[in-house]
A protein has these predicted regions:
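Concave beta-strand-loop units of leucine-rich repeat
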Residues: 1-11, 15-55, 61-191
Length: 191
């Protein structure tokens, strides 16, 4: 297994601005050890086709976490991440499945934009069926979940529901699209 670390970042614990990764060809592990806080993390492109693990072994907080065109991603590991203060913005994670988003300590997300595909025609290519990887989250500012064609289980978000309201709940284009009334009535899973 090859690992791609960013030696220029060695010793850095805080990146207050933006850390951006794009158009890489790494197929195994991309890791950012030692970094505890990032203002904005942005990642896009790549040619790994569902073979890449992106790891933040020490990350505790990030302002904006953005990963677009994530067809390269197999797994995201951030075992110490507790908070995404501004926005979680991910899309096109066609190879990600249940358990591939390792976020056991994540408790708070500002804006939660979690798209499978980026349009309805791509929804059927997405594998993820549920939100269990977000079960520890207790506070979310707003939810926008779209284009996960096999997504039928939203029970992983039940701990965060008290922090939300009907106008902050937008779910569409998935295998199951519970309304605010359905989700607050405990109808987390497609009947």
């Amino acid at each position: 297994s090859r690992a791609c670390g960013f030696t220029a970042l060695e010793g850095a614990e805080t990146i207050s601005g933006k850390l951006s990764v794009s158009n890489y060809t790494q197929n195994d592990l991309i890791t950012f050890p030692g970094i505890k806080s990032i203002g904005t993390y942005s990642q896009s492109g790549g040619k790994a086709n569902g073979q890449t693990t992106v790891s933040f072994p020490d990350l505790e907080q990030v302002g904006t976490f953005q990963m677009s065109s994530c067809s390269y991603l197999k797994k995201l590991s951030a075992p110490k991440l507790t908070e995404v203060t501004d926005k979680w913005d991910t899309s096109y994670m066609q190879y990600v499945d249940e358990g591939d988003l390792e976020l056991p300590l994540l408790r708070k997300i500002g804006v939660f934009k979690f798209w499978g595909g980026t349009y309805s025609g791509a929804a059927s290519q997405m594998k993820l069926t549920g939100m269990a990887d977000f079960a520890g989250v207790t506070e979310i500012g707003s939810v926008d979940i779209k284009y996960w064609g096999k997504m039928t289980d939203f029970s992983g978000l039940k701990n965060a529901l008290p922090s939300l309201s009907a106008d902050k709940w937008n779910v569409s284009g998935n295998g199951y699209n519970p309304t605010w009334e359905q989700i607050t009535a405990g109808e987390y899973v497609k009947p």
